[in-house]
A protein has these predicted regions:
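Hydrophobic alpha-helical transmembrane segments of polytopic membrane proteins
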Residues: 173-190
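Structured catalytic/translocation cores of nucleotide/phosphate-coupled proteins
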Residues: 25-28, 40-41, 171, 203-206, ...
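Predominantly long cytosolic amphipathic alpha-helical stalk/bundle segments
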Residues: 47-140, 147-163, 190-235
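Residue-level signature of catalytic and energy-coupling elements of molecular machines
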Residues: 14, 32, 65, 82, ...
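Hydrophobic membrane-targeting segments
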Residues: 1-54
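Internal alpha-helical transmembrane segments of multi-pass membrane proteins, especially GPCRs
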Residues: 11, 21, 125-128, 132-135, ...
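Lipid-exposed faces of alpha-helical membrane segments in multi-pass integral membrane proteins
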Residues: 19-36, 133, 137-143, 180, ...
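Hydrophobic alpha-helical transmembrane segments and adjacent short intramembrane/lumenal linkers
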Residues: 160-174
Length: 235
């Protein structure tokens, strides 16, 4: 009795099935590389954010962010947002009044929003590939399935028999490509949804941080205006 291994089913079913399985194997390899890389990067980023946030909670003035932004050994989204706000603040004039206080705060807020959007793009990097892999892999597997069934039907016509030994190679190859497609799609789909959820969660986290930093800026600006007015009244 002839035995059929998985490798025999794949390599004995023709060049087309080999190409399909090869594409799925390459997609799986790249997908897992992306998944592992993003997991490690997210853990590293989370630790950097936690350290920066702990230091941020110790300060009470917006200008003190300068000291927190000096250490750039590890990439930190919160530091990037803070630097963007500080750069925008440095462009403002030194004249603060009740009339321009709102407009000054708006400029800082817009800068924070741009930084958050930039970080969202960074967080979502390679998510598109995982989405494509999750959506196309089952169809590649289905294509291999259809091809395997067609090969079995061709073998039946060629040999004039529907015995198992005749149809088994084609049917086996069809099942192998189907399984391969699912093995690629399931992890890619799960990872895509997980990373997308984390990207959305991080965006909210970064936006909230920007709001806290903006509130600190507003308090300092308001204190400066009140100080100037108090001096004018005293004089």
């Amino acid at each position: 009795m002839q035995e059929f291994s998985v490798s025999h089913l794949v390599f004995g079913s023709g060049a087309f099935s080999i190409v399909i399985v090869g594409l799925l194997a390459a997609t799986s390899f790249v997908s897992w590389g992306v998944i592992v890389r993003k997991i490690l990067l997210q853990r590293k980023t989370a630790r950097a954010n936690a350290r920066f946030l702990a230091q941020f909670r110790k300060i009470s003035h917006f200008a003190e962010l300068q000291n927190l932004c000096r250490d750039e050994k590890v990439a930190c989204p919160l530091r990037a947002i803070s630097k963007g706000m500080l750069v925008e603040a440095s462009k403002l004039s030194g004249r603060v009044s009740y009339d321009n206080l709102h407009h000054r705060a708006e400029l800082i807020e817009e800068s924070a929003q741009r930084c958050v959007e930039t970080q969202r793009v960074v967080d979502a990097k390679y998510n598109g590939f995982l989405s494509v892999a999750a959506n196309l892999s089952p169809f590649l597997g289905l294509l291999g399935t259809v091809w395997g069934i067609m090969d079995s039907l061709w073998s039946i016509g060629k040999h004039g028999s529907a015995e198992l030994v005749v149809v088994a190679p084609g049917i086996g190859a069809a099942l192998v490509t189907t399984i391969a497609g699912l093995l690629v799609a399931i992890p890619a789909s799960g990872a895509f949804n997980l990373f997308s959820m984390r990207t959305n969660r991080n965006e909210v986290f970064y936006t909230n941080f920007g709001s806290h930093a903006l509130a600190m800026f507003k308090r300092d600006e308001l204190a400066a205006v009140e100080s100037v007015q108090a001096k004018g009244t005293a004089e």
